[in-house]
Amino acid sequence: MCVSSSIQTAILDWQCVDGIDIPVSRQFGDVYFSKDNGLLETRHVFLNGNNLTERLADLKPYQYFCVGETGFGTGLNILAVWQLWQQVRPDNHSHLHVISVEKFPLSKSDLERALRAWPELIILAEQLIEQYPFPIAGCHRLNFPDERFSLDLWLGDAHDVFPSIVKTHSVDAWFLDGFAPSCNPELWETQVLNQIVRLSDYGTTFASFSVAGILKRGLKAHGIHISRPRGFGHKREMLKAIWPFPDHESTTTVKGNQPSTQQHFAVIGAGIAGLHCAWSLAQRGHRVTLVDQSQPLSGASGNPLALLNPKLCPITQCHDHLMVLCWQYARRFYQNFEAFRLIQVNQLALKASDSLLNLAEQYPKDVLDAHSAQQSPLETQYDYLTLHYAGVISPQLFCNQVLQHPLIEFKQFKINQIIEIDGTVQLLSSEQAILESNAAIVCCARESGKLFEQYPTLKPIRGQVSWFEQHTFPFAPDQAFSYGGYCMQLHPQQLILGASFHPQRDDDEVLLEDHVHNFNLIHSVFPAYAQTLPPVEEWHGRASVRAQSPDYFPLVGQLQDHSKLFTLAGLGSKGYLFAPLNSEILVAHILGEACPVSANLLQKLNPQRFLKKVKIKKPYYSS
C-alpha cells in the first residue's frame, strides 16, 4: 500500500423507513442497503448469486473457502454469509474466511445503530462489533475460532489495498458490492477489477447488484462468463459470473491447496514463539507436538509479567508498520485468555517531546491522550502520552492455557538432528528418531543456528527485570509507566521494574549491577518516588537473553523453498507483542490461507532475506 493519510470514518445521514434506520453516505449520496429489505437483497444477490448454500455445505475436511468483498459498509453481507455458514457448515474442520475492503469505515456507534435493523443477526453483530477495529489503515484480522470463521478487514483505498494483498489462496467467491458506479466510479475502475481477477482463479464466481457496462466489460476482458438473472425486488437484473475452467470441467470445484486430513506439526522451542505457533495450528484442528530441551518458558519468555507497550508511529505509516499491526491484533487475541489484563501505559516523552505528544491528535479518540507533567500521579518533569489499550500478560498462566489444548502435547528432549525425507520431517535425539511430523517450525531463538549452518545470525541481548515489596502505590493497578524502562504493580504489594538492555551479552545470572541500572532508570524520571523504594540489595530478579535479528524484524516463514521447515524467531524484547500476529502469518503461509499483512511487509519478515539458500548443518539428510 502506498503511504496514505489517516482513515476517515463515514459521514452519515439517516432515513427512517418503516421504523428502520437506514444509513445514507453523505460522501457518495447513496444508501448502504436496500430500503426494501437489505438482508433479503444480500441473500438473493451475493449468497444465491454465488451458490454459497451448496458450495459451503459441500466443503471437504480442512478445506478453506475464501470470500472477497469490495465494500464492507455496515458488515451486512459479512453477517449474512456468517449466518449461512452456521446453518450449513459441515462438522469437519473446514473454514470460511472473508477478505473485505473499506475506505470510509463506519464509526463503532454508527455500526451498532445500522445493524439494529436486523434482529435475527444481533448475536453475530455483537461478536463483530466487539472485535471491530479502530479506524487505522491496514489489515485487521478478526478471528472467531469457535465458528471456524475469520475476517480480514482492510481499511484503505481499494486502489492501494488490492495490489498489496498476497495471493496465497485464491478468492472462491466475490461480493462486488459498494455504492452504485454512478456514485462511486473509482471502485469499479479497470485497475481495481484487474486486481480482483488477479486474486481469483478458475472456478471463482462473482455476483453484484450492478450490471453497469464498466463492470461487465472489465470481467469479460478476462474471459469471465457473465449472466444477468433477475435482480432483487424491483430491479430487473443483477450480475452473476464465473471464471470457467479452460477444459470446461465442473465449475463448482473449489480451488485451494489445503490439507484434506489432520496434519501433525512439530514445534521446536517452548517459548512465546513456539506456544503461539502451537496454539494457531491447534485452533485449526491440527495436532501439535511442542518440543524443548527445557521446561516451557525457561528462556527469555519466562519473566513473571509481560507488558504490551507498543511505540506507535505517525498515523500515515500505520498500514505497513509491524508494531502497530501487531499491537492491534494482540489486544484482540489475548482477550480470550485469563492471563491477560487490559491496562493503560503512560509513555514519558524523554526526547522529541512535541512529536510524541502530537500522536494523540493523529490517532482516533480514546486511543491516546497527551498530558503535562503536572498531571502525572508520580512527580516528574516529563510530559507523557497515555496509551489506553495496552495490556499485561501473565506468561505462566498463558502457557498453562495453551498446554491444556487437547491437540497440543509437550515433550522434553534435546534435538540433535533433523531429517527431511519423503515429505516428512523427523526429529532425532542421540541419533534415534523420536518424532515424525508433516512439517516442523523452529522457534528456539539463537539455538536455531545450531541446527542450520546459514540460519540468520541473531544477536543476544541480555535483560534483567527487578521486583520487590512496595506498599506505596500513588498510581492505579491498571496503569504502568514507560520511560526507557517500565514500572507497574506485579502483585498488590509488589512493584516490578524492567528491564536492563545489554546487546551482545548472553549471560543470564541475576546481577546487582542490573538492579542498580533499573533503579537509576526510574530515579531519572521519578526521583522522589524512587527514594521510597527499598534498597536494591533486597530486590529479586530474573535475567534472560533475547534474540534479535540484524534488521530488527522477526524471522517468519520458510527456511528454504519447497522445504517442510519453517521458523518464527528474532522477536527481541517484544515477544508477547509480536508473537500473536507473526504466528498467524506463519501458520497461514504453511496452510495456504490468506495472509493478514501486505506483500511488502511479508517480504521484510521472510527469513531468506539474509541469504540465498539455507545450508543445513551436517548431519542433516534430505531426499
From Swiss-Prot:
Ranges where the record places region tRNA (mnm(5)s(2)U34)-methyltransferase? 1-244
Give GO terms: molecular function aspect only.
Answer: flavin adenine dinucleotide binding; oxidoreductase activity, acting on the CH-NH group of donors; tRNA (5-methylaminomethyl-2-thiouridylate)(34)-methyltransferase activity
Per the entry, which co-factors are needed? FAD
Any keyword tRNA processing? yes
Q: Which Gene3D superfamilies match?
A: D-Amino Acid Oxidase, subunit A, domain 2, FAD/NAD(P)-binding domain, Vaccinia Virus protein VP39
List the EC numbers from the record. Answer: 2.1.1.61, 1.5.-.-
Query: An example Gene Ontology cellular component term from the record?
Result: cytoplasm
Which stretches are annotated as coiled coil? none
Asked if the keyword Nucleotide-binding belongs to this entry, the reply reads no
Give a short account of what the protein does: Catalyzes the last two steps in the biosynthesis of 5-methylaminomethyl-2-thiouridine (mnm(5)s(2)U) at the wobble position (U34) in tRNA. Catalyzes the FAD-dependent demodification of cmnm(5)s(2)U34 to nm(5)s(2)U34, followed by the transfer of a methyl group from S-adenosyl-L-methionine to nm(5)s(2)U34, to form mnm(5)s(2)U34.
The similarity annotation says: In the N-terminal section; belongs to the methyltransferase superfamily. tRNA (mnm(5)s(2)U34)-methyltransferase family. In the C-terminal section; belongs to the DAO family.
PANTHER family reported for this sequence: SARCOSINE DEHYDROGENASE-RELATED, TRNA 5-METHYLAMINOMETHYL-2-THIOURIDINE BIOSYNTHESIS BIFUNCTIONAL PROTEIN MNMC
In Swiss-Prot or TrEMBL terms, this protein is called tRNA 5-methylaminomethyl-2-thiouridine biosynthesis bifunctional protein MnmC
Q: Which organism is it from?
A: Acinetobacter baylyi (strain ATCC 33305 / BD413 / ADP1)
